Amino acid sequence: MTLLFADLCAIFTPYRWMIEHVTTKRGQLRIYLGAAPGVGKTYAMLGEAHRRLERGTDVVAAVVETHGRNKTAKLLEGIEMIPPRYVEYRGARFPELDVEAVLRRHPQVVLVDELAHTNTPGSKNPKRWQDVQEILDAGITVISTVNIQHLEGLNDVVEQITGIEQKEKIPDEIVRAADQVELVDITPEALRRRLAHGNVYAAERVDAALSNYFRTGNLTALREIALLWLADQVDAALEKYRADKKITATWEARERVVVAVTGGPESETLVRRASRIASKSSAELMVVHVIRGDGLAGVSAPQLGRVRELATSLGATMHTVVGDDVPTALLDFAREMNATQLVVGTSRRSRWARLFDEGIGARTVQESGGIDVHMVTHPAASRASGWSRVSPRERHIASWLAALVVPSVICAITVAWLDRFMGIGGESALFFIGVLIVALLGGVAPAALSALLSGMLLNYFLTEPRYTWTIAEPDAAVTEFVLLAMAVAVAVLVDGAASRTREARRASQEAELLALFAGSVLRGADLATLLQRVRETYSQRAVTMLRVRQGASTGETVACVGTNPCRDVDSADTAIEVGDDEFWMLMAGRKLAARDRRVLTAVATQAAGLVKQRELAEEAGQAEAIARADELRRSLLSAVSHDLRTPLAAAKVAVSSLRTEDVAFSPEDTAELLATIEESIDQLTALVANLLDSSRLAAGVIRPQLRRAYLEEAVQRALVSIGKGATGFYRSGIDRVKVDVGDAVAMADAGLLERVLANLIDNALRYAPDCVVRVNAGRVRERVLINVIDEGPGVPRGTEEQLFAPFQRPGDHDNTTGVGLGMSVARGFVEAMGGTISATDTPGGGLTVVIDLAAPEDRP
């Protein structure tokens, strides 16, 4: 059949692509991951393309960003290129991936660089990775590149390290779902040398890059993040492989130490001992507490809380699992975590005690298989009764055996030794005690059997005439009847008390579990973390949160953890319905008992609440953004209306005066009116410039080019821009500015720095009339501080930060001093250059604005 189908494909050449497209599977995604730009991701991608071309694979390039690197561009030779599709936006044309052209060409492999790229507005999809999904669905293999800083889950960490917010992001799930992720890694020193030689950026950008993003510390931290992230993905892939192949044996690919604790006084000793064992082999440490599903062997929450705090302080993770058989639950958890070592505590027990009960530690060692077990003794180790360590099934069998054995033993002892000393009343009391023992062990049914057997043995062996079923004395008959009745009645009472005790303990354990899950939510755990905690606690293969919207035929997977998760209710081994039938918690693994479902129903409700809380937070965020935008619009209209009317009115009056024929103006008056017109136009120009800058900052399109900027030149250009064309007050105001910056140099964008200084000096001249405005600068270690100092009225203490908010003016009494955007624009420009700006009081009165920028690594 396969050969025939291939022959048909060869014959019908015009339809060959259609046949392959219909019958092919989804394409594979291969990603080259790097810690920073310039490590060689694109170079490695092109090298892989040439290797595949040599093997006869049909490879084309759709998007390859060479960034002007000659070696990279040379590797493009010999690879077919698919022309980009151009998208027009704001009067410019931008090249983007042409998905339709790729689908029409339908190669075996396509190269698409920079997977996290944001498409130009007007494209079919907002993000390039969404374009790639369409190509993969068509059965085409895609090779792409990603930098670690673009992963959504690591974005905040990278921003904290580098001080730069990454605008282009890609969901972690997209990269995790790739068929292959290969790390392209070089040392920070090698990358900096490559950068210095001009192999990454153009020569004019090298100094700025080396002193900012490409600092050795930044690169080292980014490299560590990339290595750890990839190690976690390799670990997850290994776990999935072991689950798919049903491998339960321990693979010592990575050292992991699991320590079992009860919450007793010995637990802290066990955790510290396990921490020392883990530190010697640089192993991961996990602390596990087993909760008995039957409610036995409980522990107080404060004791367990102290153990949790200790585990956290030692860098360990705390886990809780549910199981009736403690050794089995421990070993199942250890095998699931692929642990190599298990630490358990044991009490010092006598030889007789070990003879009748081998204990949890001994059973754990016997069943551990390839896991190394460390037995740690401690004087305060808890000694649970042997009966509490017996599984429910074993207790059930033992109670029925006791119903047969206990009366028989009592009868034998009584006949052999006690008969000649006791009467029928004392002998009946012995059997009565035996029935109580059986009731405590197994409940009403075994106790009833024990009472019946006790009556029969008492009648046959100890009642006259003996060894017959006949009862000669009426008193004996009454005694036996009363024995049976009282034994059964007391057994019912004892069983009820024992049941209530077990229910109370079980309720306590359920409360402990609910507190555990609720604590995770209160500590800010997301939905995936909560589901992972449920999966570990109940030893499930996978847990899925499913949402079935009203009227929908299929459910929507909100979140899932584990391997091979369920995607619908019918395929789940355990399905927990939440309230209104909208949410379901689906579990794949062992089927859970009814007592576990009670807790899980509450947990599933918490999970559904997290989903709804997240949605409400998003809606609230959108509403807040709309409200802020509306408030900003009203503030803008209120502030700008005056600043537009005032210069326009002044210019109109001046022009009207000059055009009148009734008055003959002197040359001096004419010059003054023309100066008024010029000053009004300058005010309007400055207002429009600030509005445009504010909108550019809000849109996030400011891309500063950081290089060595000499502050003396920047200040002089700022003064020129302020005084250009100015007359009267502004002309005299420029003369009040005293500059003392020496030969200070900062890493900055010269144009942006000029605008910042111009806004700050202009602001000082406005609000400190007739006062000297001083501008000085100096280097402090790796930073350059620029001070703009005035001796005017200053601002009220505690309101300094308000200066940098849009449409805020010192005092904010009227609109005669400007729209209030200058300081806001200055802060936006400074932060875009990686610096900070702040305001403080000038000693003796006034305001000092401090700009903090990076200094070049090498002094000039």
From Swiss-Prot:
GO MF terms held by the record: ATP binding; phosphorelay sensor kinase activity
Catalytic reaction(s) noted: ATP + protein L-histidine = ADP + protein N-phospho-L-histidine
Top-level taxon in the UniProt lineage: Bacteria
UniProt membrane topology term: Multi-pass membrane protein
Histidine kinase domain span: 639-857
TM region(s), chain numbering: 397-417, 429-449, 477-497, 511-531
Localization per Swiss-Prot or TrEMBL: Cell membrane
InterPro entries reported for this sequence: HATPase_C_sf, His_kinase_dom, HisK_dim/P_dom, HisK_dim/P_sf, Histidine_kinase_KdpD, KdpD_sf, KdpD_TM, P-loop_NTPase
Keyword Cell wall biogenesis/degradation: no
Keywords: ATP-binding, Cell membrane, Kinase, Membrane, Nucleotide-binding, Phosphoprotein, Transferase, Transmembrane, Transmembrane helix, Two-component regulatory system
Modifications made to the protein after synthesis: Autophosphorylated.
Claim: ATP-binding is one of the keywords in the record: yes
GO cellular component, as recorded: plasma membrane
Modified residue annotations for Phosphohistidine: 642
UniProt cofactor(s): Mg(2+)
Enzyme Commission number, as recorded: 2.7.13.3
A Pfam family it matches: HisKA
Similarity comment: In the central section; belongs to the universal stress protein A family.
Function: Member of the two-component regulatory system KdpD/KdpE involved in the regulation of the kdp operon. Functions as a sensor protein kinase which is autophosphorylated at a histidine residue and transfers its phosphate group to the conserved aspartic acid residue in the regulatory domain of KdpE in response to environmental signals such as low levels of potassium ion, osmotic imbalance, acid and nutrient stresses. In turn, KdpE binds to the upstream promoter regions of target genes to positively regulate their expression.
Name of protein: Sensor protein KdpD
Organism ancestry: Bacteria, Bacillati, Actinomycetota, Actinomycetes, Mycobacteriales
